Amino acid sequence: MLFEGLQWSVPEGSVVGLLGKNGAGKSTLLHLLSGLLFPKSGAIALGQHLPKDRKPAFLEDIFFLADDVAYPGNMSIGEYERVMGAFYPGFDASQFDQILADFGLEKKVKLKELSLGERKKVFLSFALSTNCRFLLFDEPTNGLDIPSKSVFRKVVAGNIKDEQTVIISTHLVADVEKLIDRVAIIDAGKVQLDADLLELSDRLLFNTSPNLPEDSLHAEKYGTGYQFIRSRSGSEAQTPVNLELLFNAVLNKSLSNESIFQTQNSEVL
């Protein structure tokens, strides 16, 4: 069994980075959330929707961009838009045109003539243009080169609305670092850490030092010194969350929700 006793909730309007090693269950979790797989026990809800019911009102308000998308190869991008756009009441054709242009793609090209990365750009452009309330992206930067990843970050940041909830699963932490406002790290069938980045920045300090700090919660060699995480005192300036370092700390059992936030509760008491 991949997940047992899994409990997870996402605040509405969040952009969540779902992180985990390959095989940790990120894709399976997204399939469960989208209603393409069914839990053997327990319940899943997205807003008022139960994904397992696959009702039309739910299907037109969610878009799941899988890592490997099945596509009608003989269709051009424009034909794909006309056929698939009809299923999504919020689809915006002008928005689709603009995002395609940002990626340097033309509608007349057939999907089968595109590379993996180019097809990924088409489906990502379409997903954002549906304006669905729930967007689930599974490894969306797979197949993208470095310049395309930069465009990916810009188009996602520029096309997400406050009321949308977005979950981006990836093992490439740097690709989503500037996009997300919340992080969930799964390992061993459980969500080991689930937190708002502002909360983490308030609780933890991320820094480097030539020597290994005695009070570090997690540290790694970095050049000739160390990069580390330690508890932050209220008088210290906040630092940006180093997602890669945080990810490694959680997988190494150096940090968890309990170790971060129970400490906070005890300090308040």
Regions found by a protein language model. Name each.
Residues 34:
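Helix-to-loop junction immediately C-terminal to a conserved catalytic motif
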Residues 42-53, 57-58:
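Conserved ABC transporter NBD signature motif
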Residues 60, 64-122:
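ABC-family P-loop ATPase nucleotide-binding domains
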Residues 135-139, 144:
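Catalytic Walker B motif of ABC-type/P-loop ATPase nucleotide-binding domains
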